[in-house]
Amino acid sequence: MGPLSAPPCTQRITWKGVLLTASLLNFWNPPTTAQVTIEAQPPKVSEGKDVLLLVHNLPQNLAGYIWYKGQMTYLYHYITSYVVDGQRIIYGPAYSGRERVYSNASLLIQNVTQEDAGSYTLHIIKRRDGTGGVTGHFTFTLHLETPKPSISSSNLNPREAMEAVILTCDPATPAASYQWWMNGQSLPMTHRLQLSKTNRTLFIFGVTKYIAGPYECEIRNPVSASRSDPVTLNLLPKLSKPYITINNLNPRENKDVLTFTCEPKSKNYTYIWWLNGQSLPVSPRVKRPIENRILILPNVTRNETGPYQCEIRDRYGGIRSDPVTLNVLYGPDLPSIYPSFTYYRSGENLYLSCFAESNPRAQYSWTINGKFQLSGQKLSIPQITTKHSGLYACSVRNSATGKESSKSITVKVSDWILP
């Protein structure tokens, strides 16, 4: 059988996609016949055009042949088959409507797409001739001629030594390998430069001026290679981490005025203050000079302990300080005595406890009818009698704030017994 040319293309299609190239793989060389080969015509085909998978040197006495997509002869890879007797054509599950098989076993693929790239298997069956028949498999691979790649970046303006960058070589190309270049040299592997499993993605950790680029990526397959235009990262100056200075870390509630200062000072920065992870809202209580680097908090309360952070920003981004939390001294508040009931019977046990909000913890003392009894939060008198009736007072004191407070209850003890 002579070669069969693919039908001429009557419409000219401008190539915008990927060229497809056939690489030839030769198989099965029976001793009395010429070598069977498969080639693509044309050798390079544009996406949207037609390609003929032309078969040479078919053996004689054929019963038929089957084309499969891929290297496996599974049913769902079955494209089409040709039966010599009756010249019948049968289509399989992998038939797309664009394939046409000829009597010489050649396969025409029309309107080629990128999905058509890859391996094809021709299954040849000879008639039974006393030896049970002969079956041969012939495989070739249709490669994508690599397009010119481009590099996409997660961040073209990284902060020096502070930010990571992810570079990706586009497009994703089947059956191709990826290679990266930096400063015109093959990419060195360091702890700052790491590649993905496919090499298509490059991770740059903590970009410095020495690894800012230019970067290029290359897409390569067995028939071609293409390199991208260079991409250089615009390295931004490093922002030094700010810190907060404060005139008093242990202010007294409603008494001390606090002044926070965000360091360092620079005309190139914008300053932002944060409280409890939220941007500090404008409030009449909070005073901020026009540059916002200083924060003045008069009459601090226990609800304003923080944490506080300051942030410095330039037009590309910002960085926050470590948090600062205040130790606001307060109290003691008016104490509470538990339990609150005041009537007891003779012989009962008396247990009283006292509590007052205070920072640091308050000192407690008890008096009965003005006479000191003990120091501590709890007062216990077993088997009380009527002589224990009187005014019980809990006094609390905070040595840090210098404040004192007290609470009293009247306890009445009776010999009266319920019937």
Curated annotation (Swiss-Prot):
Pfam families the record matches: Ig_2 (PF13895), Ig_3 (PF13927), V-set (PF07686)
A cellular component annotation (GO) from this entry: extracellular region
Disulfide bonds: C169-C217, C262-C310, C354-C394
Residues listed as glycosylation sites in the UniProt record: N104, N111, N199, N268, N299, N303
Signal peptide: 1-34
Ranges for domain Ig-like V-type: 35-144
CDD domains membership: IgC2_CEACAM5-like (cd20948), IgI_hCEACAM_2_4_6_like (cd05740), IgV_CEACAM_D1 (cd05774)
Subcellular location: Secreted
Record's keyword terms, sorted: Disulfide bond, Glycoprotein, Immunoglobulin domain, Repeat, Secreted, Signal
PROSITE patterns to which the protein is assigned, alphabetical: IG_LIKE (PS50835)
GO BP term, example: female pregnancy
Domain of life per record: Eukaryota
InterPro entries tied to this protein: CEA_cell_adhesion, Ig-like_dom, Ig-like_dom_sf, Ig-like_fold, Ig_sub, Ig_sub2, Ig_V-set
Chief place of localization: secreted
Entry-linked SUPFAM superfamilies: Immunoglobulin (SSF48726)
Residues of the Ig-like C2-type domain: 147-234, 237-327, 332-410
Family stated for the protein in its record: Belongs to the immunoglobulin superfamily. CEA family.
The protein, known as: Pregnancy-specific beta-1-glycoprotein 4
Gene encoding the protein: PSG4
